[in-house]
Design a protein with these regions (language model features):
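Short glycine-rich, low-complexity/disordered patches
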Residues: 106-114, 130, 139-143, 164-165
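Compositionally biased, intrinsically disordered low-complexity regions enriched for acidic
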Residues: 1-86, 90, 102, 120-144, ...
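Short linear, low-complexity motifs centered on an aromatic residue
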Residues: 98-125
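Charge-patterned, phosphorylation-rich low-complexity C-terminal interaction regions
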Residues: 144-177
Length: 177
């Protein structure tokens, strides 16, 4: 795992401003899992933003950039054992703290998760570019996948799509020469 390959395109604020997590990422009542004072995090990243963008009480697909539901319910993540006490809200909470300069013993795991999801060789990044390619370059396809990638600070773009096509050709992937 290399931190050099960890470069989300969007800051936590940009993710929220774009429309993410159904507007309720930090609206879940999970105080029993944490004693962290979130006000510092909110002040650092979201100062001046409408709190309905991140503190809503109910998930609303209309709040998402792609106007679609994306992701699994919080309870599912807890059942899978993927939530840690330091960051009980998950990857995005960790990204907020990491972006503030806070480091912890979960950094390598979280960076690896990002790389596997949205990094250059990430599963979902590959998935969306393959869908775009197979749809005759319809960039409106795969809204749920694109929304999920946005949650991880990644937005599909022409430059990365061209790189994906080049890498796929070299590796004998879905694109034939």
């Amino acid at each position: 795992m290399s931190k050099l390959d960890f470069y989300p395109m969007m800051s936590p604020r940009e993710i929220i401003e774009a429309g993410a997590f159904g507007g309720c990422y930090f609206g879940l009542e999970i105080e029993e899992y944490t004693n962290y004072d979130y006000q510092e995090l909110f002040d650092y990243h979201f100062d001046g933003l409408d709190t309905s963008l991140y503190l809503g009480e109910k998930y609303s697909p209309k709040m998402n950039a792609f106007k679609t539901r994306s992701g699994m319910p919080y309870e599912y993540w807890v059942e899978q054992g993927w939530m840690h006490q330091r960051d009980p809200y998950g990857w995005f909470e960790w990204w907020c703290k990491y972006d503030m300069g806070l480091r912890g013993n979960d950094d390598d795991r979280q960076i690896s998760r990002w790389q596997n999801f949205a990094g250059v060789k990430g599963r979902w990044r590959h998935n969306i570019y393959k869908k775009i390619y197979e749809s005759n370059e319809d960039w409106t396809i795969g809204k749920r996948v694109q929304q999920s990638l946005l949650h991880w600070g990644y937005a599909t773009n022409e430059e990365d799509y061209a790189l994906w096509k080049m890498m796929s050709r070299r590796q004998g992937g879905v694109i034939s020469s």
